Structures are given as C-alpha cells and as structure tokens.
Amino acid sequence: MPPNRRTLSAACLVLASMTLPAVTIHAAPSTNTRATAVTVATLAPLDRAHTFAQVREGDAVRTLLVLALSDKNITALDLSALSGLYSTDAFDVINRFSTAQLNDLASAKRGARAYAWPDLIGVGPRGLAHIAAGTNYPAHGDEVGVADAFLFPKISPAGGPRTTIVAGPGALIDYEVEVCARFDREIRSLHDFDEARKGFFVCGDFSDRATMMRKLNLKEITSGDGFPDAKSGPDRFPSGPFLVVPTDWKRFVSELVIETHVNGERRQLAAAAHMIKDLRTIVQETLEDAATRTWSYQDGRIPMVRRLAIGTDSAILTGTGDGVVFQEPDTDTVKALMGAKDRAAQIVVIERYIASEAAKRTYLQPADRVRYSSNYLGAIDTRVIAPPRNDQ
C-alpha cells in the first residue's frame, strides 16, 4: 500500500539529510548561506587542544604536532622522529606522548620546521565502516521536514584533503560538510568513551540522491535504509588535514564552524554547537543497538559495527547543516507517488523525477569545485570529474 501523504512528504524531504592565515571566528555563523565569505582556518589554542597532521615521505608516514599556520605551510614538530614510530594511524604516535609532554614540546619548539600544505595527507581512520548521523542539525531537519536525528552506516575509505569525485550521467551528486571524530582506543562502553582521546577532523559526506530515491524506505524514514547505498563508495568520504585532540571535547565542538563552498559560492554554514545528538549520545546509541539493528545495503542487511564495539578504524560523522542541493519534490510528483498502486508504479514515478532533476543540472557537475572548511579543522578541496571514457 502506498504511504500516506505525511509519511511520503517526510520521505521526500529527508533525502537531503544524508545528507589560510590565522583569524579566529568568534561570532555565530550568519544564516545567509549564499554569501561568498570564507571561514579562514586558525590553529586551535594550544592550551586547549593539540593539532596533528601527517605527511608521507617515501614509504614512511610522519605524524606532526602543528605549532603554527601560514598561507603556504604549517610549522610542526615531527613526533614520529621523536618517538621512532612511523604509523599510518596518527593515534599510534600521539599515544606515545602525554598531554604534558606535548605541551612541553609545543612550548620549546625545538626542531620545528615548515611543511607545505599540499604535502599534508588525510587524517581519517584506515577502515571502511563508519557511523553517520542524519538530520542532526535543527536547521537541516527543518528544511527536510524531519524532527528526529537518526543513524546509519557509511561504507567508504577515508580520502584526503585534495580529492576528486565522479559525477556520471543520471547521478545526483550532493555535498555535505561534517565534523568527524575518531578515537585512540576501541570503544565498548561509555566509560571507554570518557577515557579515550578524541580526535576531530573536517570531512565530506558526498551522496547520490538518485540512489537514495530508489533505495529509501518510504514507510520508515528514520530506519536509515537507503542511506548506506547512496553515501558509500570510494570517493564519498574525503577527510581534512588536521586531527585535533582537545582537553575539553564539548567546549571544543561548541566552538567549531563548518561550511561548504561550490565554485566559490557558500552553500552551507553551520555551528557544531547546534547538533541534536552530541558525540557521546551517538556512541551510546550505536553501542546499545549494536547487537540488534541492521540496515539495507547492496540488497542485503549489515550491522553498524561488526563487533559490539567501535573500532579505531572507524569514524563518526556527526551530521550536516542546511543548504544541500536536494529540495522537496514538486506537488505533482508527491501526488503521483501517493497514488501509485504498488512499488513498481512508485519506481516509475521516482525514475521520472530523477531524470527531471538530472536535466536541471543543479547537482554537482564535472568541473565543479567543492571546498569543505572549518575554523579549527582545516579544509578539503574536491574536484568533480566525469567518469572515464570506455575507450581510454
């Protein structure tokens, strides 16, 4: 039986949810998301947080303690050289040092050197399975007509701060900027969460709204079904250049600003303080449901986590603000979906709608440039490209 109007409207709207000189930003972000002003990056105050970066030199990955930023480079200490550990996971190196030792190193600055921005690699975790929150900002929930935040899995390798994403024919590629988090240990309980070092980084959550339209569970939107298929893939999860470990994670998150620019025009601007579910709540719900809940993905069902724990190879995507491309379908489409006699008839309506949206070219197109940025977490630059030709 086709869903009723209220359910269908929510179904259509929720698709959108899942969606460098130092100048500190003190004011709350403006609601004028179409402005062109850019939130410039600054280093998180060293008395409240440590900022880490990584570079690859040959086969070795070096983990750095960042001391200063400029237009062309960062100034940092090589913690890998100091510890003798060259790990792809920054936390392996960071955990060789106490907070007090890091403070002393930052104060002394002995051995600090410059590293060019283009040499910085992504600081995301090395796994594929991540935890994502949908409609976790009130303004975004308002624009898509969904009051409650919900969770779903995202299956993607973490990319770096300079990436590409393919926008093929018929795809509706949308952008979302998010605050991401990862941990220095496996999280099996809230006690583990409270004790863990928490690292924050800016990330992108690209999605194909066409896939989401086809896969969405219209009867139960907050099940999250349809989101893993639409948001997973090799180029859907770019990560920023900085992993920031604060002493007070709640205060730090409350000061974060995130935004998206497309071809220089600001599309999204949000204050992380406005999240509905904070990081601890997301962890709690993930652990509580780990043994019982599954989500649809590639015509099967998958859990959020494979074991009853959040591993060090997983990240948490905490949601996005308003300003994504997707908008509620037009009245005729909604009526047609409501009147469809069965799922096959609904699919016909959905495919017609997807073709119409693709023809408008309002979603990301080849040659577009997307910039995700944050005041303390750095920036990600993504170039949208066409799929390779078959004759190449």
Spans of features found by a protein language model:
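Active-site microenvironments in enzyme catalytic cores
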Residues: 29-60, 69-72, 78-271, 280-281, ...
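Structural motif
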Residues: 177, 312-314, 320, 368, ...
